[in-house]
C-alpha cells in the first residue's frame, strides 16, 4: 500500500472520541437529560420585546415618564363597546365608572384614567368618533415577567360582558403577552410538522432508517442543549422568545447538514473496505475538519449580531452560536461514537427497498452523471450562466430598494387576536388616542411662562397637529405632541428631530413610537458597518485558510451577498407591500421592522457559507489531487451538488414549518430564510459559483508567496494530512482518487440528487 493510500491510524482526537463509544453515548444521554431539566420552563422567562436601543434618548425618556408620570405611558387598555347605545348613556357611564375604580384598586396597576373621568381637553381622545366605544387606560408596572403575571391575574375578570358594555383587552402589555403565547404554540406545531417530514426526507436521502435517525438525534441534542444555555442566560440578561424559533431551525438544519456530510464520508470509507474504526478516523480527519470549519463560519456570522444594542438581535446571537457549536460538537463526538458501534449496520432497515418492487436502484454513476453533465454545461457556457444568474438575482432583489422601516406592533399578530383587534379599533376610531403621539420630557426647574413659551414654539412646528400639557411634577414635566398623519410615518419621524432640535430653557428628551423607531434606525445604521466588516474580514480569513487562495474568499463574500438579494426582494414584495397576504395569512403593516433585515442577513449569510464551505472544500481537495482547475470545479460540483441540494431542501422544510407561525415576523424569518437557502443551493452553488470559477481559471488559486507559506502552516482542508506526490510539497492530498460508486446494495457514494448519500 502506498503512503498516499495508507489508512490513517486512530490517534489524538479520534482516539478520544472512539475509544469508549458506549461510554461517550451514555455520558451524552446523561448530559442531555440534565439539559432537559435545566432548560425546562425557558419560554416563560423569555421576553417578547427588545427592538429598542436601551441606551437611546427615547428609552431614557420612556423609563423616566413611567416612573414620574405613569398615566403618560398607558400599556393596558380596556375597550368598552356600548353596542347600540352610546358611551354617554347613564347605564354605560355607571358601569364604566365602576370598572375604572376597580382597575385603579388592582395591585401593580397605576395611572388609571378613562373617558368618563378625564378632563375636557383629554376626553375626546378616549372616545370613539362614532360614540359607541370608549377607553379605560392604565399602566401595569414591573418588568416583562411581572407585567405578564399581572395581566394573567386581572384580565379574565375584565374580559367579556359587564352589564350594558362588552369589554376587550389591549395595550402593549396585552400585545406582547399574546405574541409570546402564540409563538410558543406555533413553535410546538412547527416542530410537529418539521420532525416527521424531515425524517421522511432523510430516509429518502439515506435509504436506511437507522442512518436517517442519526441526524435527528444530533439535532434534538443541540436544541435541548441550547434551551439550557438560554435558560442560564436569562439569569444575567434579557433574551427574546423569538430566539427559540432559530434554535429549532438551526438545531435541526445544521445537525442534518453536518450528519449528511459525515455519514456520507463514513459510508464511502466503508465501501473501500475499511474497518469501521478506521473509517471513522478518516472521516474525522477529512469531513470532520470541514464540519468544524463550517460551524465556525456560521457562528461568526451570527456573532455579528452581538454588536447591536437591541436584545432582540443579541438573543439570536446567543441562541445561534450555542446551537451551531452544540450541533457541531454532537456531530463530531456523538455521531462518530454511534458510527463505530453501528459499523456496516448504519445501512440497516433500508425502507426504500419496500417501494422499489423490482426496479433497479440508481447507482452513484447515474446520479453523479446528472451533476457532471450540469457542471460541464455550466462551465462550457460560463459567461452566459454568470451573467444570467447574476441578472436574475439582481432583478429579484429590486423591490428592496423601496423598503420602508417601521416598528413591531400588534399587526404582527393574527387578525383575530384580541389585542390586535383592540389596537386596530383604536387606530381607526380614536384620533389622538393614548400612545399614538410623541412625549417630550422636560427636566429642570422652569416657570409657567417658560413652559407656555416652549409649548407655543413646538405647536408651531409644521408637523404638529396639537400639543397637550404640560403636566408638572417637581422638577419634571411632560408635553404630549400629536403629529399630523400616521404615528410613525415620515412626517412623525421628521418631527422627532425637530422637537429634539428645538431650543428650550430646560433639558428635553423625546419619546413615543416614532422616536423609538428613529433611535432604532440610528443604532442599526451606526453599527451595521462594523458588523458587516466583522463578517467580511473573518469570512475572508477563514476561506483563505480553507483554500489558500486570495481570490476565492473575495468571490465567496460577493457571491454570498448576491445570493441574499432574492430573499430581501421577496420580503419587501410580500410582507411590506402585502402581496400574497391573504394566501399566507398575515396583516401587512406596510413596513419592515428595522431589526429583521439584519437578523435575516446574518442567518442567511452564515448558512450560505455553510454550503460554500462544503463545495469549496471538495473543489480544493480535487485541485490538490489533480492540479487541474476545470476538473476540480466539475468534480467538486459533481460530488457535492446532490448533498448540498438535499441539505438545503431539508433545511427549507424546517424553515417553512417555522414560517407557518401566525406572528408575521416569525413567518417572514422562516419563509425568507427558506427562500435564501434554496436560491443559494440551487442557483448560486450549482450555477453561479462554477461559472465564475471557470471564468477566473487558474488565477482562482493565486496567492503571494508569504500568504502561501502562511496557508501551508495554518491552512485547513478536507484531507487526511498526507502529501500527494502528484502535487508540490506545499499541497495537501486526499487519500482518495475518485468517488466511491455503489451497486445499489446500500453502500455509500458521494453524488446524486436527493439520494446523494445512498
Give, region by region, the residue ranges found by the protein language model.
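Structured non-transmembrane domains adjacent to transmembrane bundles in polytopic membrane proteins
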Residues: 54-76, 83-176, 402-583, 591, ...
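Membrane-embedded transmembrane helical bundles of large multi-pass transporters/channels
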Residues: 1-45, 109, 142-405, 515-758
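A general boundary/transition motif marking the beginning of the first structured unit of a protein
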Residues: 5, 53, 87, 326, ...
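Loop-to-helix "switch" segment enriched in basic
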Residues: 46-50
Amino acid at each position: 500500500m502506498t503512503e498516499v493510500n495508507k489508512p490513517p491510524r486512530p490517534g489524538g482526537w479520534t482516539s478520544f472520541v472512539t475509544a469508549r463509544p458506549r461510554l461517550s453515548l451514555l455520558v451524552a444521554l446523561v448530559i442531555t437529560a440534565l439539559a432537559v431539566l435545566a432548560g425546562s420552563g425557558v419560554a416563560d422567562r423569555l421576553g417578547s420585546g427588545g427592538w429598542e436601543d436601551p441606551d437611546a434618548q427615547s428609552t431614557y425618556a420612556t423609563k423616566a415618564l413611567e416612573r414620574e408620570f405613569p398615566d403618560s405611558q398607558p400599556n393596558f387598555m380596556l375597550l368598552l363597546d356600548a353596542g347600540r347605545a352610546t358611551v354617554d348613556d347613564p347605564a354605560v357611564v355607571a358601569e364604566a365608572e365602576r370598572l375604572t375604580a376597580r382597575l385603579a384598586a388592582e395591585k401593580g396597576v397605576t395611572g388609571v384614567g378613562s373617558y368618563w373621568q378625564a378632563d375636557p381637553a383629554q376626553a375626546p381622545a378616549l372616545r370613539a368618533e362614532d360614540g359607541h366605544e370608549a377607553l379605560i387606560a392604565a399602566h401595569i408596572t414591573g418588568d416583562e415577567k411581572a407585567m405578564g403575571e399581572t395581566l394573567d391575574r386581572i384580565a379574565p375578570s375584565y374580559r367579556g360582558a359587564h352589564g350594558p358594555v362588552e369589554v376587550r383587552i389591549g395595550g402593549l402589555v396585552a400585545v406582547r403577552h399574546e405574541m409570546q403565547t402564540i409563538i410558543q404554540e406555533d413553535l410546538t406545531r412547527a416542530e410537529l410538522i418539521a420532525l416527521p417530514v424531515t425524517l421522511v426526507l432523510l430516509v429518502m436521502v439515506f435509504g436506511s432508517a437507522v442512518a436517517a435517525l442519526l441526524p435527528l438525534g444530533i439535532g434534538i441534542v443541540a436544541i435541548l442543549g441550547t434551551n439550557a444555555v438560554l435558560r442560564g442566560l436569562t439569569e444575567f440578561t434579557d433574551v427574546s422568545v423569538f430566539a427559540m424559533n432559530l434554535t429549532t431551525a438551526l438545531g435541526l438544519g445544521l445537525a442534518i447538514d453536518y450528519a449528511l456530510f459525515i455519514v456520507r464520508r463514513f459510508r464511502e470509507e466503508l465501501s473501500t473496505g475499511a474497518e469501521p474504526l478506521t473509517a471513522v478516523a478518516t472521516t474525522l480527519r477529512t469531513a470532520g475538519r470541514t464540519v468544524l470549519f463550517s460551524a465556525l463560519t456560521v457562528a461568526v456570522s451570527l456573532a455579528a449580531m452581538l454588536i447591536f444594542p437591541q436584545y432582540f438581535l443579541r438573543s439570536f446571537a446567543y441562541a445561534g452560536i450555542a446551537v451551531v457549536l452544540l450541533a457541531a460538537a454532537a456531530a463530531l463526538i456523538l455521531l462518530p461514537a454511534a458510527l463505530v458501534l453501528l459499523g456496516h449496520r448504519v445501512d440497516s432497515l433500508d425502507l426504500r427497498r419496500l417501494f422499489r418492487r423490482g426496479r433497479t436502484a440508481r447507482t452513484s454513476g447515474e446520479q453523479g452523471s446528472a451533476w457532471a453533465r450540469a457542471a460541464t454545461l455550466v462551465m462550457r457556457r460560463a459567461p452566459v450562466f454568470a451573467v444570467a444568474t447574476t441578472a436574475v438575482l439582481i432583478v429579484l432583489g429590486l423591490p428592496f430598494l423601496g423598503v420602508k422601516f417601521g416598528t413591531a406592533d400588534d399587526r404582527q399578530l393574527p387578525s383575530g387576536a384580541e389585542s390586535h383587534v383592540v389596537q386596530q379599533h383604536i387606530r381607526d376610531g380614536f384620533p389622538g388616542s393614548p400612545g399614538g403621539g410623541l412625549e417630550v420630557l422636560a427636566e429642570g426647574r422652569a416657570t409657567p411662562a417658560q413652559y407656555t413659551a416652549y409649548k407655543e414654539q413646538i405647536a408651531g412646528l409644521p408637523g404638529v397637529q396639537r400639543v397637550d400639557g404640560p403636566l408638572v411634577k417637581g422638577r419634571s414635566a411632560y408635553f404630549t405632541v400629536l403629529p399630523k398623519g400616521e404615528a410613525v410615518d415620515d412626517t412623525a419621524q421628521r418631527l422627532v428631530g425637530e422637537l429634539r432640535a428645538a431650543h428650550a430653557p430646560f433639558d428635553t428628551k423625546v419619546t413615543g413610537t416614532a422616536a423609538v423607531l428613529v433611535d432604532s434606525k440610528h443604532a442599526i445604521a451606526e453599527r451595521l458597518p462594523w458588523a458587516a466588516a466583522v463578517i467580511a474580514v473573518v469570512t475572508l480569513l477563514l476561506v483563505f485558510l480553507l483554500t489558500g487562495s486570495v481570490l476565492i474568499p473575495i468571490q465567496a463574500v460577493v457571491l454570498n451577498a448576491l445570493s441574499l438579494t432574492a430573499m430581501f426582494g421577496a420580503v419587501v414584495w410580500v410582507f411590506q407591500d402585502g402581496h400574497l397576504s391573504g394566501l399566507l395569512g398575515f396583516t401587512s403593516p406596510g413596513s419592515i421592522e428595522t431589526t429583521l433585515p439584519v437578523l435575516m442577513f446574518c442567518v442567511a449569510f452564515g448558512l450560505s457559507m455553510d454550503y460554500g464551505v462544503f463545495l469549496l472544500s471538495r473543489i480544493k481537495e480535487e485541485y490538490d489531487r489533480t492540479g487541474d482547475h476545470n476538473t476540480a470545479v466539475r468534480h467538486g460540483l459533481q460530488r457535492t451538488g446532490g448533498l448540498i441540494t438535499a441539505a438545503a431542501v431539508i433545511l427549507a422544510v424546517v424553515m417553512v414549518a417555522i414560517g407557518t407561525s401566525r406572528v408575521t415576523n416569525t413567518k417572514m424569518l422562516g419563509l425568507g430564510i427558506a427562500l435564501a437557502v434554496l436560491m443559494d443551493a440551487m442557483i448560486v452553488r450549482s450555477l453561479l459559483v462554477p461559472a465564475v470559477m471557470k471564468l477566473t481559471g487558474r488565477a482562482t488559486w493565486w496567492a503571494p508567496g508569504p500568504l502561501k507559506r502562511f496557508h501551508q502552516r495554518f491552512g485547513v482542508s478536507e484531507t487526511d494530512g498526507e502529501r500527494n506526490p502528484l502535487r508540490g510539497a506545499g499541497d495537501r492530498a486526499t487519500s482518495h482518487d475518485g468517488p466511491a460508486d455503489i451497486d445499489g446494495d446500500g453502500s455509500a457514494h458521494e453524488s446524486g440528487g436527493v439520494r446523494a448519500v445512498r
